[in-house]
Every structure is written in structure tokens, then in C-alpha cells.
Amino acid sequence: MEMKKRLMLELRNRKAADVKELVLDNCRSDDGKIIGLTSEFENLEFLSMINVNLLSVANLPKLPKLKKLELSDNRISGGLEVLAERTPNLTHLNLSGNKIKEINTLEPLKKLPHLMSLDLFNCEVTMLNNYRESVFELLPQLTFLDGFDADDQEAPDSDPEAEDLEENGEDGEDDEEDEEEFEDELDDEEDDEEGEDEEGEEEEEGDEEDEDDEDVPQGEKRKRDLEDDGDEEDDDDEEDDE
């Protein structure tokens, strides 16, 4: 499903300003860019765009209340200064499975004073010598890197903010049902359009037949009608004989 269509699904009967949690996982971005998401989502606190083939976050709008951003399994290699400019209150950032190769790529994140948790699993940068020490030194505001703090203590399984968002959000099953209903509606609209086209074609064919009859001389037309009546009478006689 395209990202714009998925946004339409998520917005059904709601205004963008009323949305606090938005999940766009596994939909298709537009040439590796975010599309359809606007600054009207001003109260958004949780945004997930996992596996949407993103190359860049350049089109991310200003989201002043965003706290948690999931961007794992994309192809982002840089441009993180956008996050510092447009998500100033970010606390959790997941960039796992992206194309982050160098520590200095993370430098723009220094401007996110509330950033507590950063995930970089399956990024090449994690293979560098002294990776963890370097990241904690670069980003002193961090508490957890890849699920562990600087003393190798594991992060809690869940954080209260995320739980609150999940409780306030719709259940996964409801989302799936809504998505199926939405797709069915789109299919019905397409079928209606096709049906209208077919009806139009049938009407045109009927009009052409009427025109053909009008073109036939009156004598010929009367002759045809008489022949048709004669055929019907013959059929009736055969039935009586039986």
C-alpha cells in the first residue's frame, strides 16, 4: 500500500491534529521520501515508518510533540540534522537496519537534548572499534544505546509513555479490519466506475441498433416484421400438431 493511501486509512473520521500515534510500517514511500505527512499532525507523539524504503527524512514535517520515532529497516545514510530541527522533543529514536556507517553521521543528534534511547542494531557503525564508548561520548544525553546503558545495564522492557500510547491507540486487529474495509471500499469504487463504463457501452450499442433500423427503408422494415410474425405462427402450428 502506498504511504499516502495508508495515511488516508489512518485518518478516517479524524483530523490530523487529533492523531497522537501513527503507524505506517511496510507501506511504500515515494522514491525513498516521506509523502503525505504534514505539519498538521502537530500533536503526534509516536511515529513508526519501519521498512518503507526510506532513503531520507528530508520531507519530515515539523512535529514539536513527537517523542518516539521508529525508522528501522530503511536505507537512511545521513541527513539527521532534520530530526534536530523538526522533532526537538524526541526521546526515543530507532535507526536499526539502516546505512549508518560513521560515528560523525550521528553528530546532529547532539541537538536533541531529550534523546534518551538510540538503537542502531544492524548498522555498519556498530562494527567500529569502541563504538559504544564513542557514541556515549558524542551524545552525553543518551541513557540507552541498543538497549543498554553505559554500564551495560539493560533498559526496561517497556516505558510508561509507550504503554500509554498503545492503550490509547486502537488494537492491532481493529487496524487490520479497518484496513480491509478501506481496501474493500476502494475496490467497490473501482468496480462501480467499471460498471458505469460497461453500461455506457451497452447504451451506445443499443443506440447504434436503433439507428440501423431507422436507416432501413419503411418497406423493407415492414417486410422484416411480417417475416418475423410468420415464423412465430409456424412455430405455433407445429406445437398444435404435436
From Swiss-Prot:
The keyword Lyase does not apply. Keywords: Chaperone, Leucine-rich repeat, Nucleus, Repeat. Transmembrane segments: none annotated. It holds the Pfam family LRR_9. Residues 148-217, 227-242 have a biased composition (Acidic residues). It is found in: Nucleus. InterPro entries: AN32 (IPR045081), Leu-rich_rpt (IPR001611), LRR_dom_sf (IPR032675), U2A'_phosphoprotein32A_C (IPR003603). GO terms for cellular component: nucleus. Multifunctional protein working as a cell cycle progression factor as well as a cell survival factor. Required for the progression from the G1 to the S phase. Anti-apoptotic protein which functions as a caspase-3 inhibitor. Has no phosphatase 2A (PP2A) inhibitor activity. Exhibits histone chaperone properties, stimulating core histones to assemble into a nucleosome. Belongs to the ANP32 family. Histone binding is mediated by the concave surface of the LRR region. This is Acidic leucine-rich nuclear phosphoprotein 32 family member B. It comes from Xenopus tropicalis.
